[in-house]
């Protein structure tokens, strides 16, 4: 594995092999200079914001035109027209039917409201997206439909971008962690025609939530570390390691953007966004990790007994709004769908959670990130910050950055952790009467909040700042500036630095004194070991090389914590039954696990067996199985640990191991298969070995992979963009890699080159 150093080229690009192109429009009203350096990274130079957006979109289209064109079809609600109603598309990291996707986007994206909302943004941002639309369209005009990549060549669904598309692209990204998770439940909500039961056992409710919305903390992941002067001996060092999809429209893309005298920033953006969202400038570097905040709440509506589309607020009947859309369908007649909306937001129905639409009640979703156009300007401020204090100001003034923590380090040796995101103003002081006990009790474990919709007094508490009504004020949201280190791997703010735990934050933001995920624990253990190992030593500072070694160590924490007890169970007996009662000898499996290096390196043997063993064990205990040493909030980094050897737990472990042995045999995978031979990225005819492993195993270099017959474990999300940044007198010193490469076009050399580098 390698990640490459990035030179900070400024405006000269003199030391870099490059291909440069000037890209004027037909009218020459917009212009940008695009310089491609190694691995196809574009450096976009423009004299103004519109030109920067123009060049950025043009360069993105060169790499990913079919990806973006396809996504525009999704956002305009036309997938059924071109691809059929029953085909699927990924929405908020879930695959749903095209018909449901079309109904969701057509029925819940209000173009008039989007146009109104964008008026509150800065002129810089409005010019940026004006140029972005023009740049994408200029690329289509120049290349022509017949010369597009094979995936969209001469396709009827490829069309020029419109201004409204740029606004939809922003809205789509804002809702990823909230409204879009319930897209199918929103479009499936319909008034009942007969009484419907809504009670549900707690355990079934948990399972239903995960089945409907996906496991947010698994699919949305990241590691963010920042080391300050007390650990580096000088300038800060930042690790940015977001775990995002390797496919579909939420891929990252690298770019360097420059407007002389106004902006000089490099990093990654997401497909369809015009600005760098994770990156660095000459003075500061930042990254994001998905936060634990709930960016939405539900409202329980009391319905009129005579009409389930009428609800009562403060004794007054209110009729639901309806939005009926007619969806064109390939090879069939149009289909009509109706979306229902209350004063709080759209109606949804999840009967398995006790949130079905019955004669008595319906449930509405209120989303803090709906129409969030504060985010684009927040990122523009972050890009121009000159310190972590400047970044903190950039994110706290608008409270616009959606659903992510911010971790940053600067050249002065200061570091920042902040969870400042749009979060409903629902606190521990919210009256109990506003949280109906019957419906909330089964949802408390998941921190899902159902408010009483019968009175406006239970709506989100007013906020003093204009444009942030109903949101928690920034002063109530957690943040810390330090000089030693901060870290986050998607657990709450509590242990951003475990030497000084944070408390006193509303529950809707996150909880304290709860078991931490294995990546959080592995990260903190690794950081403390690195600090301890350098104390009193020559060259004791933690620098970029040390940080790279830490993140790519591929250490499996689950194995460190539990494998010795598995081997102890093996020594008791190697006879086992699978979960369906078939006898299996575990002798070979136990021998393989005893020799395994407990890492997820390419040459590790036994890793596949452990992955398949640990998966059911972790599920049985909501992240960690029955432990020998239980969780202790005073020792959260080290507990829980071990496996319980009491009662029937050893038999349960043997069964899980027998199932793993049987599963690997059915797939033709040897128990001691080399990990790099079974986990591979597919790039055309190339099969590229990939290291790293599941986050549920505590592997920092996370790769969640799907079994693909004939190939093996194929990464679907995990380490995506990795940057390690520090600063010297000349500017930022950066090592970075985009694991899945810049382009989605198989004909491009940049479809696979960084994937091979990462390997």
Label each PLM-derived region with a short phrase:
Residues 2-15:
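Bacterial N-terminal signal peptides that target proteins for export
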Residues 361, 401-530, 613, 617-618:
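Hydrophobic alpha-helical segments
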Residues 497-582, 677-759:
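Terminal end segments
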Residues 30-249, 260-262, 266-275, 280, ...:
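Substrate-recognition/specificity elements adjacent to catalytic centers across diverse enzyme folds
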Residues 19, 27-32:
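Boundary at the C-terminal end of the N-terminal hydrophobic targeting segment
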Residues 259, 267-270, 279-283, 288-448:
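Glycine- and hydrophobic-rich flexible loops that cap the catalytic core of alpha/beta enzyme folds
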Residues 46, 51-97, 287-338, 461-516, ...:
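Gly/Pro-rich active-site capping loops and adjacent beta-alpha segments
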């Amino acid at each position: 594995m390698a990640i490459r150093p990035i030179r900070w080229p400024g405006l000269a690009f003199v030391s870099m092999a490059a291909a440069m192109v000037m890209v004027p429009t037909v009218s020459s009203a917009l212009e940008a200079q695009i310089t491609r350096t190694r691995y196809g990274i574009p450096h976009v130079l423009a004299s103004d914001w519109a030109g920067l957006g123009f060049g950025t979109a043009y360069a993105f289209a060169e790499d990913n035109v079919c990806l973006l064109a396809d996504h525009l079809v999704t956002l305009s609600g036309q997938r059924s027209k071109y691809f059929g109603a029953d085909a699927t598309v990924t929405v908020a990291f879930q695959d749903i039917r095209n018909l449901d996707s079309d109904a969701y986007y057509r029925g819940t994206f209000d173009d008039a409201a989007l146009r109104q909302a964008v008026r509150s943004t800065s002129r810089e941002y409005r010019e940026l997206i004006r140029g972005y639309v023009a740049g994408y369209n200029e690329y289509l005009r120049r290349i022509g439909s017949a010369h597009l990549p094979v995936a969209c060549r001469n396709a009827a669904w490829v069309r020029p971008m419109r201004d409204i598309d740029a606004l939809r692209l922003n809205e789509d990204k804002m809702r990823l962690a909230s409204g879009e998770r319930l897209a199918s439940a929103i479009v499936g909500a319909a008034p009942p025609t007969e009484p419907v039961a809504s009670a549900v056992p707690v355990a079934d409710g948990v399972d239903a939530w995960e089945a409907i919305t996906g496991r947010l903390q698994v699919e949305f992941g990241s590691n963010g570390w920042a080391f300050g002067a007390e650990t580096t001996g000088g300038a800060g060092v930042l690790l940015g390691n977001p775990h995002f999809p390797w496919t579909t429209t939420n891929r990252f893309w690298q770019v360097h953007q420059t407007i002389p005298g106004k902006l000089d920033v490099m990093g990654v953006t997401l497909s369809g966004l015009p600005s760098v969202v994770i990156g660095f400038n000459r003075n500061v570097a930042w990254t994001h990790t998905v936060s634990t905040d709930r960016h939405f709440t539900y409202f329980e509506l009391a319905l009129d007994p005579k009409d389930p589309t009428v609800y009562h607020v403060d004794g007054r009947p209110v009729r639901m709004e309806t939005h009926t859309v007619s969806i064109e369908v390939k090879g069939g007649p149009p289909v009509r769908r109706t979306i229902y909306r209350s004063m709080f937001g759209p109606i949804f129905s999840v009967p398995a959670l006790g949130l079905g639409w019955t004669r008595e009640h319906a449930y509405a979703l209120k989303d803090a990130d709906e129409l969030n156009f504060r985010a684009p300007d927040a990122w523009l401020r972050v890009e121009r910050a000159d310190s972590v204090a400047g970044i903190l100001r950039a994110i706290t003034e608008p409270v616009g950055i959606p659903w992510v923590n911010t971790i940053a380090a600067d050249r002065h040796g200061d570091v920042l952790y902040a969870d400042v995101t749009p979060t409903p103003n629902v606190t521990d002081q919210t009256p109990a009467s506003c949280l109906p006990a019957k419906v909330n009790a089964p949802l408390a474990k998941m921190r899902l909040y159902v408010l009483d919709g019968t009175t406006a007094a239970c709506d989100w508490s007013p906020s003093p700042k204009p444009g942030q009504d109903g949101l928690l004020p920034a002063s109530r949201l957690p943040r810390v500036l330090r000089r030693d280190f901060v870290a986050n791997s998607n657990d709450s703010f509590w242990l951003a630095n475990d030497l000084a735990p944070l408390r006193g934050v509303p529950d809707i933001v996150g909880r304290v004194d709860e078991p931490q995920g294995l990546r959080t624990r592995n990260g903190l253990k690794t950081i403390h070991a690195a600090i301890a190992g350098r104390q009193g030593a020559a060259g004791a500072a933690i620098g970029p090389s040390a940080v790279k070694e830490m993140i790519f160590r591929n250490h499996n924490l689950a194995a460190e914590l539990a494998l010795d007890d598995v081997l102890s169970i093996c020594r008791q007996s190697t006879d086992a039954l699978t979960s369906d009662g078939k006898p299996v000898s575990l002798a070979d499996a136990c021998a393989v696990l005893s020799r395994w290096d407990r890492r997820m390196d390419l040459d590790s043997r036994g890793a596949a067996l452990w992955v398949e063993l640990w998966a059911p064990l972790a599920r049985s205990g909501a992240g960690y199985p029955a432990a020998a040493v239980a969780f202790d909030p005073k020792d959260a980094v080290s507990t829980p640990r071990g496996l319980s050897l009491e009662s029937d737990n050893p038999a349960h472990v043997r069964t899980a191991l027998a199932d793993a042995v049987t599963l690997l045999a059915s797939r033709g995978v040897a128990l001691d298969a080399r990990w790099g031979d079974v986990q591979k990225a597919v790039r055309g005819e190339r099969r590229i070995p990939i290291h790293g492993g599941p986050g549920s195993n505590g592997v920092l270099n996370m790769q969640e992979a799907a079994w693909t017959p004939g190939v093996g474990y194929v990464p679907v999300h995990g380490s995506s963009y990795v940057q390690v940044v520090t600063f010297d007198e000349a500017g930022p010193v950066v090592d970075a890699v985009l694991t899945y490469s810049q382009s989605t076009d198989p004909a491009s050399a940049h479809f696979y080159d960084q994937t091979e580098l990462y390997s």
